[in-house]
Amino acid sequence: MSQQHTLPVTLSPALSQELLKTVPPPVNTHQEQMKQPTPLPPPCQKVPVELPVEVPSKQEEKHMTAVKGLPEQECEQQQKEPQEQELQQQHWEQHEEYQKAENPEQQLKQEKTQRDQQLNKQLEEEKKLLDQQLDQELVKRDEQLGMKKEQLLELPEQQEGHLKHLEQQEGQLKHPEQQEGQLELPEQQEGQLELPEQQEGQLELPEQQEGQLELPEQQEGQLELPEQQEGQLELPQQQEGQLELSEQQEGQLELSEQQEGQLKHLEHQEGQLEVPEEQMGQLKYLEQQEGQLKHLDQQEKQPELPEQQMGQLKHLEQQEGQPKHLEQQEGQLEQLEEQEGQLKHLEQQEGQLEHLEHQEGQLGLPEQQVLQLKQLEKQQGQPKHLEEEEGQLKHLVQQEGQLKHLVQQEGQLEQQERQVEHLEQQVGQLKHLEEQEGQLKHLEQQQGQLEVPEQQVGQPKNLEQEEKQLELPEQQEGQVKHLEKQEAQLELPEQQVGQPKHLEQQEKHLEHPEQQDGQLKHLEQQEGQLKDLEQQKGQLEQPVFAPAPGQVQDIQPALPTKGEVLLPVEHQQQKQEVQWPPKHK
C-alpha cells in the first residue's frame, strides 16, 4: 500500500511544471510579475481536479483516500521546495536576458565606471608612493642641513679651543728649560724631516698643490677633537709626538712656499695673457675715434654753416679734445687692473695665512715662522690702498658712461648739421627759381614791347590776308617752336613750387659744389641762347610787305600816337638790345 501512495505524490510536481511551461507570461507584464508574489500551487486535495479526465475513477478514489491520511504540512513542504527553486532560476534568467536586450548602454557605463575606479585606485597608490619618497628625501636633506649647521656652529668653538691651546703653548715657550727639552730631536725625528715620496709626487701635480693649500684631512680631524688636544697638552710624552708632527709640517710649509712661487709665476703669465685682449679693445676704440675725426674733417671741408652751426662745431672741437683725456684714463685703468691682480695675490696670501694660523694653533711654530707671519700681516695693510684704487675705478667707469653720452650727442649734432645743409640747399634753389621767374616776367614784358600795335602798323585787313600768304620759311617756324619749348621749360609751374619731393631730388643733385658750377654754366649758356633767339624773333616779327600781282598799293607809314616819335628800325633794335639784361630785384 505504501508504494501505491507514493507514486501519485512524485508525479504531481512534473505535471505542475508542464502546466507552467505551456502558459508563458507576456513580455510587457514581466515587471508586474516580479513585483507580485509567486503563486503557490494549490493544496494536495485540489491537485487531482486538474488532472485529465482519462484517469480512471478507482485511482482517484485511492489517491484521495491516501492523501487524506498524510499531514498537510509535509505535502506543502514537498511541493514548495523544488517549485520555488525552479521558479527563482527562471525569473533570474528572464530578468538577465531582458536587461541585456534592453539596456546595453547601462552595461557599457558600468564597465567604464569599473575601469575608472580601477585606474583611480592605481593613481592614488602611485601618488602615495611618490609622496612617501619625497617625504623621505626631504627628511634626508633636512638631516644633512642640520649636520652642516652643527658643523659650522662647532667651528668657532673649536677655534676658541685652539686659541686656548696656543696660549698654553706660549706659556710653555716662556720657560727655556721646557723649550730646550722639547726642541731636542731624536734620530727618528730627523728621519721624519725628510720629504716623503708622497710629497714629491704632489709637487709634480699643480692641481694637487692647490688642494694642499687648503686644510688637510688630518688637520680637520684635529679641529674636531679639541678635548683630546687639551689632554695631550697635559702629557709631556704626547707633546713630544706633536713636536715630531710639527717638524713634518715645517717640511710641508717649505713645500707650500715653493708652490706659492710657482703659483705667482703662473698668475704673472695669466696677467700677461690678459693684457693683449685689453689692448685689442683699446685699438678698436681708437679706430672708431679716428673714423669720427675723419668724418668731422669732411664736414669742415663743406660750405660754411650759419652762426648756430659754428657754435655747434666749436662744441664738437671741444669734445674732440676729450679722447686725449680718455687715453690717460685708459692708462690709469691698466694700472688699476694690475693692482687688482696684486689684490688677488694678496687674497691668496691671506688664505695661506689662515692656513698657517690653523697650523700654529695645533703645533706652535718656531721664531722664524713668527717673523714671517708678522711680515705677512704688514702686507695685509695694503688692501686699504687697493680699496681707494677701486673707488677710482668706479669713478673712471662713470666717466666712460659720460663719454658714451657725449658720443650720442655728437651723432645728434651731425644729424642736425645735415638737416641745416639740406634746408640751405632748398633756400638756394628757391632763390634760383625766383630769379628764373623774374627773368620770365622780364621776357614777357619785352615780348609785349616787341609786339607792334595795330594802330602803329596802320595796315588794313587786306594786308593781313597778304601776310598769311607770305608765311615764314620752315626753318624760321622750327626756330620759333624751339623758342617756345625753351620758354615753357624756363617757366616755373605752380606744381613745382608746392611739391617738396621735386625739391628733394634737386637737393640731391645740388649736393656737390662741382655739379652746381656745371649747372650755373649750363644756365648761362641757356641765357645766351635765349638772347640770340629773341634777336632772331625780333627780326622775324618785322613786317614784310609784298604787293599782290597786278596791284600797287601805297603803304603809308604808321602814324605815331600822341607823345610818340617814330624812329628808324636801327634805333629800335638798339633799344631792344639795351633793355635785354634783366633787372635783378
Curated annotation (Swiss-Prot):
Keywords: Cytoplasm, Isopeptide bond, Keratinization, Lipoprotein, Repeat
Sequence repeat feature ranges: 153-162, 163-172, 173-182, 183-192, 193-202, 203-212, 213-222, 223-232, 233-242, 243-252, 253-262, 263-272, 273-282, 283-292, 293-302, 303-312, 313-322, 323-332, 333-342, 343-352, 353-362, 363-372, 373-382, 383-392, 393-402, 403-412, 413-422, 423-432, 433-442, 443-452, 453-462, 463-472, 473-482, 483-492, 493-502, 503-512, 513-522, 523-532, 533-542
Compositional bias ranges of the Low complexity kind: 179-261, 361-383, 445-462
Polar residues biased stretches: 1-15
Pfam families the UniProt entry points to: Involucrin (PF00904), Involucrin_N (PF10583)
Annotated function: Part of the insoluble cornified cell envelope (CE) of stratified squamous epithelia.
Protein's UniProt name: Involucrin
Originating organism: Homo sapiens
Lineage, top ranks: Eukaryota, Metazoa, Chordata, Craniata, Vertebrata
